[in-house]
Amino acid sequence: MVNIHIKLNENTIMYIYRNITEKLQRALKIYPVVLIGGARQVGKTTLVKNVLANQGYNYYTLDDRSTLLFAQRDPQGFIENLSGPVVIDEIQRVPELLLAIKYVSDQDPKAGRFVITGSVNPMLLPSVADSLRGR
């Protein structure tokens, strides 16, 4: 069970259980790439950080300027240099990463290798949709 932390004020935190938790855990056992999409500020990042906190995932956010610049400059190199299972947050900022993820996951389709989050569904991007179907 995972809870979402909501800070009500400086001293009070409320926890909200999310039903998506079990679905995420099941998907991580089946698929090499798991996408968590949704509108801004709905708890995607918090969900992922809580669910995967003790599972050995390395977390990368494309809100970090240096991470963003590296990913934009060399999407394939960025993905190939990641170690272990990874979370890439805000994937919509560098959609070219999706093709690199496809390539790497085709080479090694280990379940749960990539968890990506974003506020734009990459499957709606014409250049990406066909490449990632079924992953």
Q: Regions from the language model: what does each represent?
A:
Residues 1-135:
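Phosphate-binding site recognition
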